[in-house]
Swiss-Prot record:
Main location: periplasm
Signal peptide: 1-23
Keyword Signal recorded: yes
PANTHER family given in the database record: PROTEIN YCEI
Pfam family, one: YceI
Protein name (Swiss-Prot/TrEMBL): UPF0312 protein PFLU_5725
Homology family: Belongs to the UPF0312 family. Type 1 subfamily.
Entry's Gene Ontology cellular component terms: periplasmic space
Organism: Pseudomonas fluorescens (strain SBW25)
Keyword tags: Periplasm, Signal
Localization, UniProt: Periplasm
């Protein structure tokens, strides 16, 4: 009788474990140039300056069945900003704005993911930028997941937010340039 009870318990535990889906860990695919952090800011209220950060890295965990358990962490080297104009890049990197010599890194670490639709979520986390940490929420869209041609698995997302520069101790260059829009595209390779 004890053997039958133990066998039933073992089978039940195995079946329950098999039914549980665990969040998978992904490395953001920077090497393959399948991930970007782009930004834009108003120029005098007449047009927009667009740019990107070239040096950054990150990871995320993703569970399609339980998106609220997902997490993301990103580290950006602020000196890697690029706006297709070398003199402007130097000025943005200077003490006048980002002061990249003093604040070499910007970091985002998620604290909560709230599903807002079938393929959308609000991703809230702590953004550390210019030596200040503040909560920020990104509007994220799940693009898809599946196998790649090289035998791996991938998942992809887009996320957008607007950041007020004054919140991070950065004085914008004018009244129309107090906010910066961030547009992030992430494709991650599932880790084994």
């Amino acid at each position: 009788m004890l053997k039958k009870t133990l066998a039933a318990l073992a089978i039940g535990t195995a079946l329950l474990s098999a039914g549980q889906v665990m969040a998978a860990d992904y490395k953001i695919d920077k090497e393959g140039q399948h991930a970007f952090i782009d930004w834009k800011i108003s120029h005098l209220g007449y047009s927009y300056i667009h740019g990107t950060f070239k040096d950054w890295d990150g990871t995320f965990s993703w569970d399609a069945a339980k998106p609220e358990t997902s997490k993301i962490a990103v580290d950006v080297k602020t000196a890697s900003l690029w706006s297709n104009h070398a003199e402007r890049d130097k000025h943005i990197a200077s003490k006048d704005f980002l002061d990249v010599a003093k604040f070499a890194d910007a970091k985002f670490v998620s604290t909560a993911v709230k599903s807002t639709g079938e393929k959308t979520a609000d991703v809230t986390g702590d953004l550390t930028f210019h030596g200040v940490t503040k909560p920020v929420t990104f509007k994220a869209t799940f693009n898809g997941e599946g196998k790649d041609p090289w035998g791996g698995e991938r998942a992809g997302f887009n996320a957008k937010t607007t950041v007020n520069l004054n919140d991070f101790g950065i004085k914008g260059p004018g009244p129309s340039s107090q906010t910066v829009d961030l547009d992030i595209s992430l494709e991650g390779v599932k880790q084994k």
